[in-house]
Each structure stands twice: as C-alpha cells, then as structure tokens.
Amino acid sequence: MSRFPGLVLAFLAAAFLAAASPAAATGEIESLITDADRERLANYETTRERASEEARAGGSPQDRATFDQVVAPEPMSWSDFDMTGEWQCRTIKAGGLAQLVVYGWFKCRVTDDGSGWTLEKLTGSQRTKGRFFTDSDTRLTYLGSYAVNDDPFPPYGSGPETDQAGYAFRAGANWWRIEFPSPKRESKLDILELKR
C-alpha cells in the first residue's frame, strides 16, 4: 500500500522532467522536418566553416566587412525577445559561385498565431515563409518554403526545390539572423539578416 504514493510521485517527477526537456520543446519539429533538411542541419558547422572561408577569400572589401559584422556576435538568449512586427531584412550569400554577395534591404514581417512565430519575407524576388521551433535558449530552428516573385508559397515538405531549413540567432536588441546551410541555389550558406 505504501508503494502506491511513491510510484505516483515518481511518475509525476518523470512527467515534469520530460515536459521541461529540450526534446519535448522541439518534439513537433521531429514530425515535420524532412530527412534532407535534417541532414543539412546536422552538417551546419562544417558547411558554415567552408562557406565562411570562401566568403573571406572573395567579394569586395565592403562585403567582407559586412559578412564579418553579421556573423561575429555571440548568440544571445531568445527568452526575453519579442520577434513580432516589421523588420528590414537582407540576404547574404556566402561560398559557392560568387563567393560572397550582400543584397540590399527588403521588408519582412513576423507574426504570432498563438502557436509560435511565423516569418514572411514580403518584398524582393526571392522570398521565404516559415515557422520557428526552439532548439536551445540561444538557437531557434526555422523551417520554411521558398517562392519567387509573387508565386504562392508551397507548404513545407513539398520537396528540396522549395524546402528551407536554418538556425536563427539573436545578435542584439533589434538584430538577428537566420543561417541556411546548403541552400538549393547559388551558395553554400545563405544568411537572412533582420534589423529594426
């Protein structure tokens, strides 16, 4: 008879620990992420290092300075950050054919539908739309879709031509970025920088 309360307490403790674990926080992503994107993210560090080497070996001095400024900050905690609202955003392509290209600023928006943040790049010829998932206190995972011009966004999981995956890092009070390893087009690493 005395074992019953002990079992209940053990069960409740296990349930609490499971709910608090990072795996529980990112459980939803495991049912969504494609195998190809899982592999891209698994190779993120190596891809980023190679792309950074190529970027620093090419591109204009101004673009190299911009690249270093964007990737240099240590990631900050997302816990006290409200991402919702309007943002300026620009793409930086590192590694690959052109080695380094920094594009101009466009408009992005982040909304919160109650189940999490959703990003949409509103202007420019190459756009993205997707959701964020907690990976750690200082890193979010982004899963989204790519569209050109005014084409509609296909749902995530439609295939490697349009699926996108990356890691988001906060760099300041109103400054963050998403790094996309091994994008489908043109580069080894795409960075979407966002400021307001």
Give the ranges of each region predicted by the language model.
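An anionic, turn-rich surface loop/hairpin at beta-sheet edges
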Residues: G96-F106, T141-Y167
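Amphipathic/hydrophobic helical signal segments and adjacent flexible N-terminal regions
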Residues: F4, A24-D82
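Edge beta-strand at a domain terminus
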Residues: R64-Q69, G157-A168, G172-R196
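Bacterial N-terminal signal peptides
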Residues: V8-A19
